[in-house]
Amino acid sequence: MNKYNLVLLCGGGGSEHDISLLSAKYFESCLATLPRFNTLWLELTAEGQFRTREGEIVELTNRREIRFADEAKAPWSVDYVIPCIHGYPGETGDIQSWFNLIRLPYFGCGSEASSNCFNKITAKMWFSALGIPNTPYLYLDEPSNDAIARVEAAFDEWGSVFIKAASQGSSVGCFPAHRREDIPGLVRKAFEYAPFVVVEKTIKARELEVAVYDYQGEIVATRPGEIVCAANTFYSFEEKYDTKSQAVTHVEAPDVDEETVAAIRDYALRAFKGMKLRHLSRIDFFLTEDNQILLNEINTFPGLTQISMFPKMLAHHGHDFATFLEQAILAELEGR
């Protein structure tokens, strides 16, 4: 049997750099059980350098090999890479574009699918095109007085809004607006995080999540899990990743009827297939009190920390993450 050299790439230098390192540790623990892979941990720094765990700066070349600063070390040929980078430049599709150019196989969604899902405005256009209901919204391209007036009008109609940087992940640059007078400041603040902003109607609803992934030639959608925030508050970046988070998670959402479960899974599969995702994603929904289903967002590289939902839902569905990972990699490298 062939053994393959695999780069586990993490970090990225963005707002989710440290979370990426935690997720990479989960990948590393799984890869340690798979004898067919030699794994090299690389951290992509904010300066754009590749750094080994020992702190050595290396180069990942267009020839798909690692070159070390110590020229006495032979180049290390790379067969495959796992870009475990949340946010920029991983989930944005940027680094996948480079891998495509140098023909380096990688784990996760492709560059276009990643970009389409990461930008909240583009994603909503796709959801609507696929016939998947989503939250009412408007988008802004500048923090002008006219734009702020449009948000105030939406606030008057909807009662409350979320103001979100259109191209950030994990609730970064997202602000709930409960008072009209807060809107100008929050709009300007959101524009500090991205060149476009999306404003959504606040939905009072349960937050359900579905793990969708490729497994042995089939696309699997789990039964929805649920996040219950403390005091029904906004699921912030801190609530998502702090080990002291007060949010409660259910690997399978309680008290959801089978018809609704089936509809949610159908929408999740429709989004995964229609947007040409691959390998894995976490697809998040709102479920309102009157049983209305709204697709909230798609995470093309979901967190894999000790409190993350994706690996828990996969295991609850009866699949082992290491086995899932191995078959995904070998399917690409060996055409299985």
Curated annotation (Swiss-Prot):
Q: What sequence ranges are listed for the domain ATP-grasp? A: 124-330
Q: Which residues bind ATP?
A: 154-209
The protein depicted here goes by the name D-alanine--D-alanine ligase
General function of this protein: Cell wall formation.
A GO biological process of this protein is: peptidoglycan biosynthetic process
Species lineage: Bacteria, Pseudomonadati, Pseudomonadota, Gammaproteobacteria, Alteromonadales
Q: Where does Mg(2+) 2 bind?
A: E297, N299
Name the pathway. Answer: Cell wall biogenesis; peptidoglycan biosynthesis
Task: Output the HAMAP family linked to this UniProt entry.
Answer: Dala_Dala_lig
Q: Which UniProt keywords apply?
A: ATP-binding, Cell shape, Cell wall biogenesis/degradation, Cytoplasm, Ligase, Magnesium, Manganese, Metal-binding, Nucleotide-binding, Peptidoglycan synthesis
Q: Which GO terms describe its cellular component?
A: cytosol
Alphabetical list of Pfam families matching this protein: Dala_Dala_lig_C, Dala_Dala_lig_N
Q: Has the keyword Ligase been applied to this entry?
A: yes
Please share the entry's free-text remark on the cofactor.
Binds 2 magnesium or manganese ions per subunit.
Species annotation: Shewanella amazonensis (strain ATCC BAA-1098 / SB2B)
Q: Which cofactor does it need?
A: Mg(2+); Mn(2+)
Q: Does the keyword Transferase apply?
A: no
Give residues annotated as binding Mg(2+) 1. D284, E297
